[in-house]
Amino acid sequence: GKGSVCAFLTSVFREAGLKVGIYEEGSVLNILYQGVTSGWYPPLIFLGIGAMTDFSALISNPKLMLVGAAAQFGIFGAYMIALAIGFDPMQAGAIGIIGGADGPTAIFLSSKLAPNLMGAIAVSAYSYMALVPVIQPPIMRWLTSKNERLIRMKPPRVVSHTEKVMFPIIGLLLTTFLVPSGLPLLGMLFFGNLLKESGVTRRLANTASGPLIDTITILLGLTVGASTQASEFLTLDSIKIFGLGALSFVIATASGVIFVKIFNLFLKKGNKINPLIGNAGVSAVPDSARISQVVGLEYDPTNYLLMHAMGPNVAGVIGSAVAAGILLGFLM
């Protein structure tokens, strides 16, 4: 089988004096893995994400930023629980970021705070991102009433080109002053978005959002996967991490929905927000927003929530990176 072939090739390479292991200094995998350990793969992925993201839904309705922020309670909730069950603060911070539903952010933070847990954290983050359609709908239905699910939101206003260009510039400046530790991620996110929205660097934006992000994703998956060796991955801590990851997703989804319900108490009737977009604050783009749309259509086939849900969804991307910067600043 393939395993015996790989074992045979590995033995041949070692007999020839060639280094092949990811932890063997000088091997190809080890060189590629430095992009993970030194933390420059995730910022490059954020560059690509910024170049493919349209922030119009958020700019047209800025209060949706608060929904994205509320969903980050999952991160800090999981952090507190991880501390309570025996993880040290740095490990707990790395585990908590799973609740942000952002794989590159989870890898970036865990590579800084808990490199020994990075494989389990990365697998957990990406696994639960894929399980968003399974985890979120029951929570959304349980926490909302029929009348709340039928709320119709105002159509988003048209956003000018000037606003689209100014948003990443202002975002970059605010990030620099408020959360400097998150600058490697958010700085690249806003820079990538500026490439897209400026209109004069279309080729660079297309490269960042296409070939570059695809290449880095392949290298990231290859090296993180190669680092998850059985002796380090199949442990009791890994099981705890998977459990905490699931819990953080539940907390994040619930906190987003509950926040919208509370926020609606202070909004006039025509300005209310459909609580079904509260789940979209979990930054699994665009899966969380699609779930808002799918669940909403079950109760009203003419109520399209996707464009509204994209606001908290992209806000969640920013929020998870801000949370990572806060944890990094306090714990290192």
Predicted features, each with a name:
Residues 116-134, 242-252, 277-280:
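Alpha-helical transmembrane segments
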Residues 38-39, 46-52, 67-77, 81, ...:
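Alpha-helical membrane segments and immediately flanking helix-loop junctions
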Residues 80-89, 121-149, 255-269, 315-332:
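Juxtamembrane and boundary regions of transmembrane helices in multi-pass small-molecule transporters
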Residues 55-79, 231-257, 309-313:
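Entry/N-cap segments of selected transmembrane alpha helices
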Residues 124-200:
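Membrane-embedded hairpin module used as a gating/binding unit in multi-pass transport
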Residues 30-45, 91-99, 126, 180-190, ...:
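Structural signature of hydrophobic alpha-helical transmembrane segments
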Residues 172-260:
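Transmembrane helical segments that form the transport core of multi-pass membrane transport proteins
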Residues 1-25:
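Phosphate-binding loop of NTP-binding sites
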